[in-house]
Swiss-Prot record:
Organism, as annotated: Vibrio vulnificus (strain CMCP6)
Highest taxon of source: Bacteria
EC number annotated for this UniProt entry: 5.4.99.28, 5.4.99.29
Enzyme class: isomerase
Keyword match tRNA processing: yes
GO biological process per UniProt: enzyme-directed rRNA pseudouridine synthesis; tRNA processing
Name this protein carries in UniProt: Dual-specificity RNA pseudouridine synthase RluA
Length: 250
């Protein structure tokens, strides 16, 4: 399923929310690729924009083009290796917000559905109990909404345990409440409700690659301004980077 037209937002060109000698964090807008695509017309990306000012900048994780929010980059190879290892061992934690179609009945829960690439329709993913990779997403209802036109939506706080491609989007669809504006997994009114995918990476916790102390970063959510810095209310990681020899490899 090819991208029909790529018109990424340009104002602001970059929005840096934190920077030191080792890491740089930005608020990536919806509609901008995390890294360049294969075609020349898809070169514009969060990474390529940062590289104009930071030639040594390194990618350590990605967000879907349509997802907005927090991305952390490494400013040198040593920081890149340290951060990538944390993602590999699932030492990072993330909090997302999503507006989904309809009112979700349960106040909280865990979605445990294995995912696999829907190869004929790639990059779409699908639930596959036989061949899919284990995928878990905890969720909490933040707010149930009724709009002026009668439409019902729910603001969801999503806490991914695993990090599969399109995981949050497919899990919400499987729950019966697709994320509004989702060009792959929402249909009809759920798709047309919003001009963008209303999925935002708000918080990330990790261990600083130099000091090895736990820290977190937060980016406010445009479509849910009540989002607050609360990641350590949901996760309780060690305050200092653990010994990798004591950890199971993801």
């Amino acid at each position: 399923m090819a991208m029909l037209e790529y018109l990424p937002p340009t104002d602001p060109w970059t929005e840096i929310i934190f920077e030191d000698d080792h890491i740089l964090a930005v608020n990536k807008p919806s509609g901008l690729l995390s890294v360049p695509g294969r075609l020349p017309e898809h070169h514009d990306s969060m990474w390529s924009r940062l590289q104009e000012q930071y030639p040594e900048i390194q990618v350590v994780h990605r967000l879907d083009m349509s997802t907005s929010g927090l991305m952390v980059f490494a400013k040198n190879k040593r920081a890149e290796a340290a951060l990538k290892k944390q993602f590999q061992y699932r030492l990072t934690h993330k909090v997302y917000y999503a507006r989904v179609w309809g009112h979700v009945e349960a106040d909280s829960g865990m979605i445990d559905l294995p995912l696999i690439c829907d190869w004929p329709n790639r990059p779409m993913q699908k639930v596959c109990h036989e061949h899919g990779k284990p995928s878990q997403t905890a969720f909490q209802v933040a707010k149930r909404e009724v709009h002026a036109n009668g439409a019902q939506t729910t603001i969801m706080r999503l806490l991914p345990v695993t990090g599969r491609s399109h995981q949050l989007r497919v899990h919400m669809q499987a729950l019966g409440h697709p994320i509004v504006g989702d060009e792959f997994y929402a249909q009809g009114d759920a798709f047309t409700f919003s001009e963008r995918l209303e999925l935002h990476a708000a918080e990330l916790s990790f261990y600083h690659p130099k000091s090895h102390w736990l820290r977190s970063l937060f980016v406010p959510c445009d479509f849910y301004p009540d989002a607050e810095e609360m990641i350590f209310s949901y996760f309780d990681p060690a305050r200092k980077l653990p010994d990798y020899k004591s950890l199971p490899k993801s």
